[in-house]
Amino acid sequence: MEIVQNFSSAALTTGILLGCLGVIFLPSIVYAAFLLGAVFFCLAGIYVLLHADFVAAAQVLVYVGAINVLILFAIMLVNPQDAPPRALDSPPLIPGIACIGLLGVLVQMISTTSWLTPPWTPEPNSLPVLGGHLFSDCLLAFEVMSLVLLVALVGAIVLARREPVERSS
């Protein structure tokens, strides 16, 4: 059974890495959006391997079913033209320095991390614990997020129902 989990974990991780590289390097934004959905599915598979079934289902419903579809609708509404990319006005010195700095931090974190951890057994049903934390410790953040989503929904409805303004010449 452990060999199946190791293979599944390696396959899902490879899918995540290849999908992320495709999102970054593909010239078509539509293909990049579809690959982002594949990355979200692979991440849900990782959650299933970690016995977090509810989080995996929420990942698929929220990120694949809502966020990724929203990104695809935005791409279709904007209708990106196949214009050639602009040339950089200046050399990418600042982003290069930032990337080298982040690489240094990453190498330092990897070299100082203790990778030997004790074996961990997940709780068979962690949903009540998650619900308890969500509605006790994180109640304010949960309510603020629900208000932000409500405002975003009302704003989207107002923008979608707006009548075009006719100009007289």
UniProtKB/Swiss-Prot annotation:
Keywords: Chloroplast, Membrane, NAD, NADP, Plastid, Plastoquinone, Quinone, Thylakoid, Translocase, Transmembrane, Transmembrane helix, Transport
Membrane topology term: Multi-pass membrane protein
GO cellular component, one term: chloroplast thylakoid membrane
EC category name: translocase
Gene Ontology terms, MF aspect: NADH dehydrogenase (ubiquinone) activity; quinone binding
Taxonomy, superkingdom: Eukaryota
InterPro entries registered for this protein in UniProt: NADH_UbQ/plastoQ_OxRdtase_su6, Nuo/plastoQ_OxRdtase_6_NuoJ
Catalysed transformations (reactions): a plastoquinone + NADH + (n+1) H(+)(in) = a plastoquinol + NAD(+) + n H(+)(out); a plastoquinone + NADPH + (n+1) H(+)(in) = a plastoquinol + NADP(+) + n H(+)(out)
EC number(s) given by UniProt: 7.1.1.-
Residues spanning the membrane: 7-27, 29-49, 58-78, 90-110, 139-159
Compartment annotation: Plastid, Chloroplast thylakoid membrane
PANTHER family listed in its UniProt record: NADH-UBIQUINONE OXIDOREDUCTASE CHAIN 6
Family named by the database record: Belongs to the complex I subunit 6 family.
Role noted for this protein: NDH shuttles electrons from NAD(P)H:plastoquinone, via FMN and iron-sulfur (Fe-S) centers, to quinones in the photosynthetic chain and possibly in a chloroplast respiratory chain. The immediate electron acceptor for the enzyme in this species is believed to be plastoquinone. Couples the redox reaction to proton translocation, and thus conserves the redox energy in a proton gradient.
Assembly information from the UniProt record: NDH is composed of at least 16 different subunits, 5 of which are encoded in the nucleus.
Name this polypeptide is given: NAD(P)H-quinone oxidoreductase subunit 6, chloroplastic
Lineage: Eukaryota, Viridiplantae, Chlorophyta, Nephroselmidophyceae, Nephroselmidales
Gene name of the record: ndhG
